[in-house]
């Protein structure tokens, strides 16, 4: 029944997908920033 409702509402599904993509992109950006900051810290410590 819920699958039927979801199939009849493509706009909501598209909105959910875009929100999920945005959340994944934000997580990736945060992880990349943390990795770069850690790399800079180790570079400064071992300089």
Swiss-Prot record:
Q: What is the name listed in the Swiss-Prot or TrEMBL entry for this protein? A: Protein RL9A
Keywords, A to Z, come to: Host membrane, Membrane, Transmembrane, Transmembrane helix
Where would you find this protein in the cell? Host membrane
Taken from the UniProt entry, a GO cellular component term is: membrane
Span-the-membrane segments of this chain are: 27-47
Question: Main localization of the protein?
Answer: host cell
Q: Which region is the signal sequence?
A: none
Query: What does the record say about its membrane topology?
Result: Single-pass membrane protein
Keyword DNA-binding (UniProt): no
**Protein species of origin:** Human cytomegalovirus (strain Merlin)
């Amino acid at each position: 029944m819920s699958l039927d409702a979801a199939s009849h509402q493509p706009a909501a599904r598209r909105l959910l997908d875009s929100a999920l993509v945005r959340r994944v992109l934000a997580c990736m950006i945060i992880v990349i920033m943390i990795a770069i900051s850690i790399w800079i810290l180790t570079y400064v410590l071992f300089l």
